[in-house]
Amino acid sequence: IQLLTESQQIPPVPQPWLPPLKERIYSTDLRKGNFKEFWSHTNRSLKAVIGYVDIPSQQAQYTLEHDFNEDGNIALFGGPLTGKSTFIQTLTMDLARQFTPNQVNFYLLDFGTNGLLPLRQLPHVADTIMIDDQEKITKLINRIKGEIRYRKALLRQHMVANVNLYQEISGHQIPKLFFMLDGYDAIKESPLVMELEDAFQIISREGLSLGMYLVITAGRIGVVKAALLASIKTRISLKLTDDIDTRTLIGRTQLIIEDKPGRAMIKLDEPEIFQVALPTKGDDAFEVIEQISSEAGMMSEQWEGSRPKPIPIVPEELSFDTFAKTISVQKALKENTLPLGLDFVNVESVDIPMKGFKHLLYIANEGEHLENITRHLLEIFTTLIPSKKVMLMDVDDEYDGQFNLFARISETETLEDMANQLMLELEDRKKGETGHDFIIFIPNLEKFVQASGLTGEQVSALYQEGWKYNMHFVVGSSYSYISNNAIGSPARQIKAYNQHYLLGMRLTDQTILEKPYNSKEPYLNKDEVYLYGRPSSVKLKITI
């Protein structure tokens, strides 16, 4: 019969059932067009293609989209190799094609098997966070809290209920933030598990009105706290080990998910089966990943606007070249401030004003630490502050030819008379003679005092009067020497009149300066210091 109907070109009788879902469906077929076309259109609804659904009871099959404005956050569960990472890839790529980086930003929390790494090149991606990135996770949590406070304040100021209304009234666009978490099961491995769960709970509860959305995947239902799961409206199940878990998640149904990658169940009016779309075309997983990387790279090349700021992380080792080229360091120099290092929170320059600068004392309780601070500061003054002339008291003859110095004093005979020469220079300047704007750099105070015979009385005069006549002292000392409180000693006088302090040691281990009690204060590495201040000190990363 089939051969006869085909030979006579007789059209087939309509079938009572639609064809079964294909195993490979591509999101680019379900939403036609390219990102250049989509980016030129504004005011698109926040919908993302997730797959193709089959509804036998209605004899219908159609593209399944998720509307984040209406349906909020998503939790997807599935066994190994069922397509959890693919789901997030599809969701992310479809949103990235439709919206510019000014409109949507992504935080990729890749707690699974590196399934989100191909998405990193997207210009929309603020950062990628792994489960062992403890510093990044801490800063992400703080950023989430800060962003929630900021967005709530904007809504209060304009007396509106959600971000969409705020944008209509103010004309100011703020990006929608998506936290894409693949592999929620691994969260228990993090020492910050409680803080993470609290942050996700806040997003799921309050994020919808603030334009902040959470998408999570997990291998088992039990790993997600009941309170968090209850606040997530859209739940999807891929094939799980036990079909009972699917019914627990989606609701009572006779449907069973086939054991095929990407085959899933979602509750619409009733539980329905759908096929998760693939993010790009490709004959196998490798080709799909290559296509994701290629398209993401094209988006990155095409986008010329601003991009989301990554979570700042202090590098393991900070070279001076990297430090000097840091934007905040360059900004500090233009504003006539002295950059001393990078803070550990925002990874930006911490600086002190050059106007009114008098003297700086740096202290460490280990010789290697003291020497590293010396080299760091010498590099700053000789390379970044050309208006100052550095005169180095090189008692140990360590720094020959290493820095662009105005003068290096290392000969014993010259050092022996240096205290008197400094006093004579001060007197001459007080009488009106002009001279260079000097940084008098003393890396080892104890040995300089021994070599020059510097007295406490001379220190008092130089420290109280010298800065008024462009004679500024940058002095390094071991803690054991500078803690000497003998009446009239140079160490005591320096402490009495010093302006700025850098400490290469735990605050709790010194008694020179006031300090908060902290029994758990960690020891510093040799490329870490405190810039002392009241009421709080700032921990800095310095070059090495």
Which role fits each region the language model picked out?
Residues I1-G51, K225-L342, S349, N485-I544:
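Phosphate-binding and hydrolysis-coupling loops of NTP-dependent motor/remodeling domains
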Residues N34-L240, I244, I257, D269, ...:
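P-loop NTPase catalytic phosphate-binding loop
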